[in-house]
A protein has these predicted regions:
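A contiguous, mid-protein "functional segment" used to position or interact
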Residues: 140, 150-178, 302-361
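Short, low-complexity cationic-aromatic patches
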Residues: 69-75, 88-100, 130-131, 137-138, ...
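Conserved short histidine dyad/triad with adjacent acidic residue
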Residues: 61-68, 79-96, 239-255, 275-276, ...
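A short beta-strand-loop-beta hairpin characteristic of the jelly-roll/cupin
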Residues: 90, 95-127, 137, 253, ...
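A short, N-terminal "cap"/entry segment at the start of jelly-roll beta-barrel domains
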Residues: 2-76, 167-239, 349-390
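Eukaryotic modular interaction domains in large regulatory/scaffold proteins
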Residues: 226-227, 237-240, 246-248, 258-260, ...
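Glycine-enriched catalytic-core subsegment of oxygenase/oxidase enzymes
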Residues: 269-300, 308-309, 331-348
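Conserved metal-binding segment of the jelly-roll/cupin
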Residues: 85-87, 105, 123-145, 155-158, ...
């Protein structure tokens, strides 16, 4: 006969579990609590045809109106704040224990940054400017126009950071100064930078992201060019890629949260899917100012230029959060075939339907297909080869 409270065949004692009266354990979501406290408009989606047309609600401390965008993913690595500073307006000074990258959608203005009230720095920005605020530095944004609003997006790693510390007092009132990241250097926001191997460009301020110099990245396909951005010594990672008329990039996959913002192009789209049979595939048509967010883990996505000029996009993502080796740039497998253990589908391995969708969209835009050098069943012309040949 088995003794009560002892697991049969072992010497482990098993505590009796009450049949009733127990409650399910739940922990408060610090990020969701912050959103409610801010009373800010929230969008949960992964595709926005126009950042300029997103309807905003009041967000006075940011200088006017705003909204928070995030994907429907409980492992959300980042979010996106869409903010419009009213004409002549300014934000309230703030600092915080999460990283943030700004991209100016429209307008002009300035940002003042400081650790010490007596030693403030101010730099100016315009439409197309890209910059990062050093971790926990004080800053304030100003609209430089008295007649027009200034709109920007700010991609942050606030969701995981807030959920890690679960304390707003620490997140927004910690007085520690990360001087290894920013110590008041006069040239910090000068726009100067340094080029490293693997197309890595280190700079804290990019005055005009739609026209900055990019470098060849033939592994991602069809004459594409790219720069991997390292900014403000952040864990957050950004990059800019461009590809020629009548071409498309190879599909690849990675985790959720990469925000892709179209900087140039007159037509094109992204395909996004997770299932092997692509039964969940979405086609996201884009224009300048469209944003597509990678919504899921192991989510394939592929970008197509069906317009009549170059297509360039900016990708803003949370990065590795300190979990991987400290290499600059993108993931080591981003341009490696899945046949070799990477994340990328080579042109010869993609389903023919992908190219058919591309050629159909090209015809609608009156643009030629220029993928013959890469896709044998292409009905168009040779176009670029492996280099930057438009």
């Amino acid at each position: 006969m088995v003794m009560p409270g002892v697991m049969q065949g072992t010497d482990m004692k098993v505590a009796d579990t009450p049949n009733e009266g127990l409650q399910e354990y739940r922990t408060a979501d610090a990020y969701e609590a912050w959103l409610k406290k801010e009373r800010v408009k929230v969008y949960e989606d992964f595709y926005f045809p126009s950042l300029a047309k997103i309807e905003l609600g009041p967000w006075e401390r940011k200088g006017g109106k705003g909204a928070v965008v995030h994907i429907a993913n409980r492992h959300m690595p980042d979010d996106c704040h869409v903010v419009e500073i009213k004409p002549g307006g300014k934000s309230e000074p703030e600092h915080h224990m999460y990283e943030v990258t700004f991209y100016v959608v429209s307008g002009r203005g300035a940002t003042t940054i400081w650790h010490d009230e007596k030693h403030k720095q101010t730099f100016e920005w315009n439409t197309g400017s890209l910059f990062c605020i050093p971790l926990n530095a004080w800053y304030q944004n100003f609209n430089g126009s008295g007649a027009e609003p200034a709109r920007y997006i700010a991609v942050t790693n606030a969701p995981p950071m807030m959920r890690l510390f679960k304390d707003d007092e620490f997140m927004f009132n910690c007085d520690f100064k990360f001087r290894s990241r920013y110590a008041g250097e006069e040239d910090y926001f000068s726009g100067n930078g340094k080029l490293f191997t693997r197309r890595v460009w280190e700079s804290n301020f990019i005055p005009n992201a739609p026209d900055m110099a990019l470098y060849g990245w033939k592994e991602r396909g069809a004459g594409g060019i790219n720069a991997m951005l390292e900014m403000a010594d952040n864990n957050m990672k950004n990059h800019i890629s461009e590809f020629p008329i009548g071409t498309y990039k190879k599909a690849h996959r990675h985790g959720p949260g990469a925000h892709l913002v179209l900087l140039s192009g007159t037509g094109g789209f992204s395909l996004v899917w997770t299932k092997a049979d692509r039964s969940d595939m979405s086609k996201c048509d884009w224009q300048i100012g469209s944003m597509v967010i990678v919504p899921n883990d192991d989510c394939f996505h592929q970008h197509f230029n069906t317009g009549t000029n170059r297509a360039r996009y900016l990708a803003l993502r949370a990065g590795d959060m300190g979990l991987n080796s400290p290499h600059g740039g993108g993931g080591a497998n981003a341009d490696v075939s899945i046949k070799e253990g990477g994340w990328q589908i080579e042109y010869e391995d993609e389903d023919r339907e992908i190219h058919q969708i591309f050629e159909k969209d090209l015809k609608a835009h009156g643009a030629p297909c220029r993928m013959k050098a890469f896709v044998p069943w292409c009905t168009g012309e040779v176009g670029p080869t492996s280099g930057r040949d438009t």
